[in-house]
Amino acid sequence: MKPNSFKKLYAEGKVPVGHMLFEFTTRGIPEILEVAGSDFVVIDMEHNAFNIADTADLISWFRATDIAVFVRVPEVHYSHIARIMDSGGHGVMAPNVKSVEQAQALVDAA
């Protein structure tokens, strides 16, 4: 896995620039975003039809770039988070975390 460019930029006090991906599971998307200067992408599984297979494919295509990949999972559930991390995602964004227990479940799953 390539180093997390988002983490590096943040540590240097720079502001990473990125995109949220809601549609289009084509192999050209990572290259387009790289040429556009993106430092990171958030793949949204909460508000679209991306399933885990689509998302894993996108993550693998982004690994050919220096773009850090984060995924907004549909819910805080171990199977979603573990699969994203196992696929090579750099991190997850979890929706509707409303308690310390939910936040801890998220950390435990990662």
Which residues fall in each region the model found?
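Expand to "…catalyze enediolate/carbanion chemistry for C-C bond making/breaking, isomerization
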Residues: M1-A110
